[in-house]
């Protein structure tokens, strides 16, 4: 009789431990997801979503660019003088505003998140019409399309293109990993970025 009681007690204990294990696993998964969403935020979502939609870009790409280039700091100035969330140079901004869109805006507007995101997205769109792969688009955005064109002349096809600059190559890899992370965090479970 005693062994039956122990058997029932052991079975009950195992079931309780399994339930606790499942709950802890679920809670851990939720905590990890929350931490990852903190690390990979969706700040400026209204502007990013609107511009991505307007320029037919995947918003995850725009979030990844902002995350990797400025870490969502609209006042960020890089060592080479690029400004704002999407790290545009004054020269690129003036070329976009004057020659591409005919708007003739002051470069001081690069600090404005809405303006910076809009022109960063437009520049990405421009580069997607010029190049066939996102790796090449990122390389051109990070360096200069003229330099990337030169690199491409040294490669038989764009599909075989290997970025010869190690720093640019590493940054493009990092951006693509961040794009993948945003897609995983904000799209997998129907939680689309908006």
Label every model-predicted segment.
Residues 10-29:
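Hydrophobic membrane-insertion alpha-helices, especially the h-region
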